[in-house]
Regions:
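A glycine- and small/hydrophobic-rich beta-loop-beta segment
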Residues: 32-95, 99
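Predominant activation on well-ordered alpha-helical scaffold segments within soluble catalytic domains
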Residues: 1-6, 41, 45, 113, ...
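Secondary-structure transition/capping motifs at alpha-helix termini
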Residues: 6-15, 50-61, 122-126, 153
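Conserved structured core elements
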Residues: 11-16, 34-41, 110, 136
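Active-site-adjacent substrate-binding region
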Residues: 73-160
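Alpha-helix capping and helix-loop boundary segments enriched in small/acidic/polar residues
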Residues: 30-35, 104-107
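Alpha-helical metal-binding/catalytic segments enriched in His/Glu/Asp
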Residues: 1-28
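Beta-strand segments within the central parallel beta-sheet cores of soluble alpha/beta enzyme folds
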Residues: 14-24, 59-68, 130-133
Length: 161
């Protein structure tokens, strides 16, 4: 995440940047093409093997990795401002949103939030926070699914809409 926030070329670092897109997110992600399927874990495992990593080194690679789960974020609706926490209400056009939920509906934790927001700050990108209102039911993202399956530290972010 930090390396990706700095201008560079592929030869400047040894990180492997992966972009994964999944199907069936709106119906639970439980398909072979969804985030709950095997594809991302399989690709990362095969990549590690191709680089000569053994099983222990693969676990270490996952532990050193980071994941950005990017989706939409709910911005404040002018007719229903009470549906948002008064101190965490994303506004359209004011930067990406870091999504946080005490019930683990988002994968963000203190470490991944600090990494993400630090990268945004270094890039000169304003960032907002959405903290789920415990009085209002909250959906989820694929972030907790992939984080649970792979053990890769993940931050959930979104564009306010």
């Amino acid at each position: 995440m930090i390396g990706a926030a700095s201008p560079s070329t592929a030869s400047d670092h040894k990180d492997i940047l992966v972009m994964a897109a999944f199907d069936h997110e709106e119906v639970g992600s439980a398909s072979r093409y969804g985030a709950a399927g095997p594809i991302l874990g399989d690709v990362l495992t095969r990549t590690a093997r191709a680089l000569g990593a053994n099983e222990e080194q693969r676990f270490q690679m996952f532990a050193r990795s980071s994941c950005v789960s990017a989706d939409a974020a709910h911005s404040v609706h002018p007719n229903f401002p009470d549906k948002h926490d008064p101190t965490h209400h994303p506004i359209i056009g004011r930067g990406p949103v870091t999504k946080i939920n005490g019930n683990q509906r988002y994968a963000s934790d203190a470490t991944t939030v600090a990494l993400w927001e630090g990268a945004c700050q270094r890039a000169g990108v304003p960032v907002q926070r959405f903290v789920g209102n415990n009085d209002v039911p909250c959906g989820s993202t694929i972030g907790p699914i992939s984080a649970t399956r792979l053990g890769i530290p993940t931050v959930d972010v979104g564009v306010p809409m």
